[in-house]
Amino acid sequence: MDKEREKQVYLARLAEQAERYDEMVEAMKTVAKMDVELTVEERNLVSVGYKNVIGARRASWRILSSIEQKEESKGHDQNVKRIKTYQQRVEDELTKYALTLSVIDEHVVPSSTSGESTVFYYKMKGDYYRYLAEFKSGDDRKEAADQSLKAYEAATATASADLAPTHPIRLGLALNFSVFYYEILNSPERACHLAKQAFDEAIAELDSLSEESYKDSTLIMQLLRDNFTLWTSDLEEGGEHSKGDERQGEN
């Protein structure tokens, strides 16, 4: 392995252990720009870094949004204004990180030779544009949703051709794509169809499931089934959140 690449991967590992995820992302972006095919470990370092920097800010945004609603109900207009300003800072950070995902299109995907890696990266891109669509509005929301849809569709095309229905990455993709249809495109019927199809196809090939991915695959299958049940029984009320990637573990 090239010495600079080895150094950056080591720094990313250090940053992960020190929980300095912003620096972890920067180190792995440097590796990605070398236009080399990433190893499974490197791929996971990219994913963990982004998941943490974006996940933390996403959680912050939701907390601020909840506080804003409470202050609004009490008529505390000045506090609402302060919260909105603070929330905008978090949104700007989220946007900045999601947009650095261009490194996936420009460097990582072109260097990938396996279907598994291609699905992994497009799924990741779809996830993060979905996160942007959660808090954007107007044309910005539409743009984020369009980018997310394209990435999920590209991932699905490759997954259908190259990965078994029981593969945890293919199942994780179906889980998150169905959540996208339900929560971003407000299309519960499409979400239900996608979740049920992925679950049924995996069940049909359960006997061929490898021992190493059994736990991950069956967990995601359970989440697919839970969402399908939730969405079909609660379409009228629509008050519950879907079980998406936060609970599916690494895949």
Curated annotation (Swiss-Prot):
Per the record, the similarity remark reads: Belongs to the 14-3-3 family.
Descriptive protein name: 14-3-3-like protein
Annotated InterPro entries? 14-3-3, 14-3-3_CS, 14-3-3_dom_sf, 14-3-3_domain
Tissue-level expression reads: Most abundant in roots and flowers.
Q: Which GO terms describe its biological process?
A: protein localization; signal transduction
Q: What domain of life?
A: Eukaryota
Q: Name one GO cellular component term.
A: cytoplasm
Q: Which SMART domains match?
A: 14_3_3
Recorded hits in SUPFAM superfamilies, A to Z, give: 14-3-3 protein
Q: Which Gene3D superfamilies match?
A: 14-3-3 domain (1.20.190.20)
